[in-house]
Amino acid sequence: MLQQVTSTTVTGADIQLRAKLLLFSMTDDQCVYCKGKMEHRMWVQCEACPQWVHVQCIPEECLSGGEYPSRSSDIAAFECSAHGTARARLALKGKRRRVEAKEEPERAGTRRYRLRKRGPLDYIALNEGQDVRLRHEHPHRAAFQGCFTKWSGLGRTVTSAELQQSFAELREPVLVADPEHSGMQTPAMDEQVLADVLGADYSLDVMDVQSQQNERWTMGQWKEYMHTARGVRDRIRNVISLEVSHVPEFGQRIRRPRAVEDNDLVDLVWPVQPAPEIGAKPKVQKYVLMSAANAYTDFHLDFAGTSVYYSLLRGAKQFLLFPPTPANLGAYKAWCADDNQGLIFLGDRLQDGVSFSLRPGDLFMIPSGFIHAVYTPEDSFVVGGNYLCLRDLSTHIRIVRIEQETQVPKKFTFPKFERVMGLTAEWLLEGLPERLQLITHEHAVALLDYLRDTRLKYKPAHYHTKSTMLASLEKALEGCEPASGP
């Protein structure tokens, strides 16, 4: 690290000479202090030029708050010493504030003019794309809109009766024409209601749209953020993992569509009075999703390729979806493994897409394994949930293997999936031969192969070991051919 700047008197000529020498020696992606390229460190870019530096390399006397920030979102502004000042300046946000404080009138005009000219910078680390992003628009938005238009007009709409009667054959996303007849019910809900019921200190994950990374906030902070005018919010944010089935005020009053209630595999196989080692059902059935306008969730697979029901209470949503074909899943895996993933718009590499626009009151159903991205034109509030089903057993297992190959963190996988598969095997054996007729041969083989993995630990309730359970299931399959499938 270079020697820190001292506090000795510096003349105007000295400042100009130093600025010229510094600009001459700069390279955009090399820290001017340590000359290194240590990408594991937090970086920040100068507002007035393309220069990046390591935050920890900035001299302490240049810090407005006297201490280094712990994360990039704490940084309000940075200006290097090559722009007519004796030393660099790193300004930090107030610790308890989510939006920038009002500036003095004489500076506010200059600041507003600058924002109109180039927009506020996003101080995400250099190794997350090496591009200067705008805080209020995700860089893939234009590509998303082009792809959305390309695949528009292909979406299908069904009635609630058709959804119920033809659920086993449903292989594409659909809008429900008459959601009021689907069985879906939700109480009156918004951010204020959530804060009142859960409490202002309730902790939740909030996604930063630009980085697609989560931060821990309180419900009170989120309510304050959503009640802040769009133009002064510090960043675009999303809440997509707030599960509320355990909250009596919501869990008991939110009713899922009948087609979901009738086909949820967990409800089908989970014991009414589970043993302590089995425990409670996975909490994935009832989520609240809240998004600020311009929020964007990049392409993803829902954990274990679960199917999704999605009821929009307020705002607007745009979905872009692609089926789980071998080619699309292969492109998805390659994209996940690419070091430049954040710079690549995956939609340009996928085929057979479909797009949907959702408005308040819409009920949307996504079948298993669809790769999708979501854009939010307006502040929105959604109730939805995930579910496994016998119809898609082999797809669920295929997606779980992709999650393993792409090293998805356990936090973002389906809770207790191995246990659900073990319980499914026991449930099938308890109802021979009729229950085997409910799944295809492909599903049965996929289930057996998955459970045979020696790394998978499962203790059956009615068999001495997992091996004896699987032997019984294999023998049953030999004498009872499962359904042939659609």
Swiss-Prot record:
Annotated keywords: Chromatin regulator, Dioxygenase, Iron, Metal-binding, Nucleus, Oxidoreductase, Transcription, Transcription regulation, Zinc, Zinc-finger
Subcellular location: Nucleus
Residues covered by the JmjC domain: 245-404
Residues binding substrate, per UniProt: T297, K317
Superkingdom of source: Eukaryota
Cofactor annotation comment: Binds 1 Fe(2+) ion per subunit.
Gene Ontology BP, a term: regulation of transcription by RNA polymerase II
GO MF, any single term: histone H3K36me/H3K36me2 demethylase activity
Catalyzed reaction equations: N(6),N(6)-dimethyl-L-lysyl(36)-[histone H3] + 2 2-oxoglutarate + 2 O2 = L-lysyl(36)-[histone H3] + 2 formaldehyde + 2 succinate + 2 CO2
Residues at which Fe cation binds: H300, D302, H372
One cellular-component annotation, GO: nucleus
Chief location of this protein within or outside the cell: nucleus
E.C. designation(s): 1.14.11.27
Gene3D superfamilies named in the record: Cupin
Needed co-factor(s): Fe(2+)
InterPro entries assigned: JHDM1_Histone_Demethylase, JmjC_dom, Znf_FYVE_PHD
Zinc finger (PHD-type): 28-83
Function: Histone demethylase that specifically demethylates 'Lys-36' of histone H3, thereby playing a central role in histone code.
Family membership noted in the UniProt record: Belongs to the JHDM1 histone demethylase family.
Domain topic, free-text comment: The JmjC domain mediates the demethylation activity.
Protein's name according to its UniProt entry: JmjC domain-containing histone demethylation protein 1
Lineage, highest ranks first: Eukaryota, Fungi, Dikarya, Ascomycota, Saccharomycotina
